[in-house]
Amino acid sequence: MKSNSQDAASIVWHPQLVTKQARNQSNGHKSRMIWFTGLSGSGKSTIANAVQAELFKRGIQVYVLDGDNLRHGLNADLSFSMEDRKENIRRTAEVGKLFVDAGLVVLAALISPVEEERQRARSRFAEDEFLEVYVSCTLQECEKRDPKGLYKKARKGEIPQFTGIHQPYEEPKNPDICIDTTDRTVEQSVQIILPIILEKIAWKEGEQ
């Protein structure tokens, strides 16, 4: 019986006639992976969706990969164990890479608590294709917000292995963008992040 490595060695990558560069040129902007990381309740998904709306208004091809949404389908078979969290990030990075190759700006919003796994996700992209956005917020504020009631359930022991309560969150060592949402509104956060993303994707007002 062949090993997985032997099977993989016999698989050849099939190049496409339409390249990523051609898609970027057609779209009028560069494709990028924007990876939002932070505690539950910090505002990752809310900010990512607000940024998506602003980019979409400008005619930019954009899509949000939300961690919770992915667990309804692609990652529905995964638990919250450390090994499954790693696989969750791996799958999301691979899907995101396909979307970037297709010419999209991808906004991934996942807790992704382990620095090593975030760096592994980054390694799947070209050096200038991946931007890490650390959505910083104190645990106290996240727990106060608790929009999904998860912290309350975790404190009661109803949710094991919950990041910030039972498992640590490793802060990014050198994020491309750091935004503290403890005392900032979503709108204020978007105003800080959006210009940076527009510059990174080389989009210019009035060219669409």
Curated annotation (Swiss-Prot):
CDD domains per record: APSK
- EC number annotated for this UniProt entry: 2.7.1.25
Keyword Magnesium appears in the UniProt entry: no
Keyword match Kinase: yes
The function of this protein is: Catalyzes the synthesis of activated sulfate.
The name on file for this protein is Probable adenylyl-sulfate kinase
The record ties this protein, via Pfam families, to:
APS_kinase
Question: What GO biological process terms are annotated to this protein in UniProt?
Answer: hydrogen sulfide biosynthetic process; sulfate assimilation
**Disulphide-bonded residues:** none
Q: Which reaction does it catalyse?
A: adenosine 5'-phosphosulfate + ATP = 3'-phosphoadenylyl sulfate + ADP + H(+)
The record places the active site at 112
Q: Which family does it belong to?
A: Belongs to the APS kinase family.
Pathway the protein contributes to:
Sulfur metabolism; hydrogen sulfide biosynthesis; sulfite from sulfate: step 2/3
InterPro entries in UniProt = APS_kinase (IPR002891), P-loop_NTPase (IPR027417)
Q: Which UniProt keywords apply?
A: ATP-binding, Kinase, Nucleotide-binding, Phosphoprotein, Transferase
Which EC class is this protein assigned? transferase
> Which residues participate in ATP binding?
38-45
Which Gene Ontology molecular-function terms are recorded? Answer: adenylylsulfate kinase activity; ATP binding
Q: Which domain of life is it from?
A: Bacteria
